[in-house]
């Protein structure tokens, strides 16, 4: 426990150094939400529950930024700086190392949720029962494991430059095609077919089913679990093969 606490203190210091990045990861989705939701604020025949659903979309967008940029970047930096090798020669085990990374990311997730939810409620008047707010936050955190799996897979790339390029393409592609920026019903049929196969779309389906019907979307849940498990398993296998080569 003491070693895990010490690692978390280090993570906190690193977070302070990357404060500008964290402000952007929360600030940009919040700005998008205020801009696009403002277009529908005074529209009587606007889409039902648009303010609420777009609030959830932009929260997921913010969390995806943390999982696909901050998480892999930190792991890659630790690797090239030999921090991971150093820890292997100390009493700290790698499970504690990864737990500290996950803890740091969970804190980032909670900050994203708190900020974007607060803006939606206080500025745009989004109102839900307390149970719905808590349930939506919980499902966002659990569902975002799929993005963590993607971020971990990015660490297999040989350079930080390539990791950044591929990460940006995935980030924007998943956001647009998966329906975080706009409903995929506006897309041609072939683009809709692609969008429905993406984790961003399935995460939003999970949230919409919970908020609209109070239940769990089983197909979306299974998709996210299988997607995450396959990527985690593939990454662990390839990383092990790479280290033993």
Predicted regions and their residues:
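Transmembrane helix segments
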Residues: 35-40, 155-197, 201
């Amino acid at each position: 426990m003491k070693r895990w606490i010490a690692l978390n203190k280090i993570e906190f210091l690193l977070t302070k150094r990357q404060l500008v990045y964290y402000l952007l990861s929360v600030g940009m989705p919040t700005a998008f939400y205020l801009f696009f939701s403002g277009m529908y604020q005074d529209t009587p025949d606007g889409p039902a529950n648009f303010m609420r659903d777009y609030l959830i979309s932009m929260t997921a967008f913010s969390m995806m930024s943390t999982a696909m940029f901050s998480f892999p970047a930190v792991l890659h930096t630790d690797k090239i700086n030999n921090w991971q090798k150093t820890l292997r020669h100390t009493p700290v085990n790698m499970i504690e190392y990864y737990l500290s990374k996950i803890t740091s990311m969970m804190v980032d997730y909670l900050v994203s949720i708190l900020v974007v939810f607060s803006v939606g409620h206080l500025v745009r008047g989004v109102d839900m029962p307390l149970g719905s707010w808590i349930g939506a936050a919980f499902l966002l955190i659990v569902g975002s494991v799929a993005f963590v799996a993607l971020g971990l897979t990015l660490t297999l790339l040989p350079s930080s430059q390539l990791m950044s390029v591929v990460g940006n393409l995935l980030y924007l592609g998943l956001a647009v095609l998966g329906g975080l920026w706009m409903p995929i019903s506006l897309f041609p049929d072939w683009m809709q077919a692609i969008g429905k196969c993406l984790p961003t779309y399935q995460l939003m389906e999970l949230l919409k089913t919970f908020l609209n019907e109070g239940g769990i979307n089983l197909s979306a849940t299974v998709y996210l679990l299988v997607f995450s498990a396959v990527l985690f398993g593939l990454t662990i296998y390839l990383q092990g093969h790479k280290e033993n080569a």
